[in-house]
Amino acid sequence: MAVKTVQYVFNGQTYDLTFDASTGEYKATVPAPSKSSYSQDGHKYGGSVIATDDAGNSTTINQSDATFGANLLLRVLEKVAPTLAFTYPTAGAYITNATPVIKFKVTDNDSGINPDTIVIKVDGAKVTTAFTKTEVTDGYECSYTPGTALADGAHTVSIEASDYDGNAASAKTVSFTVDTIPPTLTLTNPADELITNKTALVVSGKTDDVTSKPVTVTVNGASVTVNSDGSFSKEITLVNGSNTITVVATDKAGKTTTVTRKVTLDTGAPVFEKVTLTPNPVGCGKTFIISVKVTD
């Protein structure tokens, strides 16, 4: 009897093998699965081969066969690298916390993330202390809190990771600025406790912030234009009596500095209530007293 057919059952499909007279072997070209084999038993796909002769007798071997089973196990590697994403801080952020909790997520929906390959670098220096890796669907959510406060200024964090099939994601970076110091704010006008009879008053001053320029300024809640050198001025209208002027400078990180001034507007002229000369009349060369009662 002769072999009639040879079939290969793999990944739910059956493939007919063709006899190659030059080698004396049966062969077929089979497409690899679209998913990697990492989630399979032993991280490999199994299969079976069925040989049938002209009489209808058949022999089947599969991955459990003692002789050829290992040869029927196929490892399939994925080609897609993991996805990396920062959740905090965001790119270009200005933050006031010098020890921010840096959070990011690494995912791979095929062979999976190899947690040993997750790397985080702060300003180019690899983090060697432990950081949190929490397993989630398709990957890990990670967080790291610097053990030492970051200096005020710009910082860059980068992350790296690979999947179990060795695909390495391109490093992902995020740059942000730490600002723990509020802006400077000085008022050149008005002086505190000023008393004036003018209803129009110019509020002027200067502000600056080394880390988080530009600084915005409000006078009694109204926005004021700040010049490139940090100077500003705004004319306001006083009400009769006591006026409180509140000037607030805010930097890009949200830090604020507030200066207040008390100004009194008095538009009423003094009123004379009484004027007397004593004695009156007075002798030549003598002295007399003038007495005035006046209110305001």
At which residue positions do the language-model features occur?
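Solvent-exposed loop/turn segments flanking beta-strands in beta-repeat/beta-sandwich domains
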Residues: 1-10, 108-122, 207-219, 296
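Short, surface-exposed loop motifs enriched in S/T, G, D/E and P with embedded aromatic residues
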Residues: 12-21, 32, 127-133, 222-228
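Aromatic sugar-binding surface patches on proteins
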Residues: 21-34, 136-144, 228-232
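Surface-exposed, short loops/turns at beta-strand junctions within beta-sandwich domains
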Residues: 32-44, 147-154, 235-242
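Flexible, low-complexity linkers/stalks enriched in Thr/Pro that connect modular domains
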Residues: 65-85, 173-183, 261-270
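Short, solvent-exposed loop/linker segments at the N-terminal edge
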Residues: 92-98, 192-199, 280-286
